[in-house]
């Protein structure tokens, strides 16, 4: 599984989710590619991301299988990861 994570330094929800994601990575082996909404503008545009951050785009076998927008609980993300499968 691979996750593209898009956030911004001005986004308070992103700061919260960074901590949540770090906890998840302690439990799961997930390749994570991080983009900054402002600094990586060209890359971010490829993912059709709106104004609500953070965005987590889950890939399995190089296909997008799920997208999470905004703050979610750790348990919600774990449920998604378990459903997709590593």
Functional labels for PLM-detected ranges:
Residues 1-2, 40, 61:
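Preference for well-ordered, secondary-structure-rich cores of eukaryotic proteins
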Residues 58-86:
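Non-catalytic, surface beta->alpha helical segment in thiol-disulfide oxidoreductase systems
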Residues 1-26:
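Local sequence-structure signature of Cys/Sec-based thiol-disulfide redox active-site neighborhoods
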Residues 5-7, 25, 29-42:
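Thiol-based oxidoreductase modules, predominantly thioredoxin-like and allied folds used
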Residues 12, 39, 72-75:
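Short alpha-helical
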Residues 47-57:
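Structural micro-motif
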Residues 19, 46-47:
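Chalcogenol-based redox active-site neighborhoods
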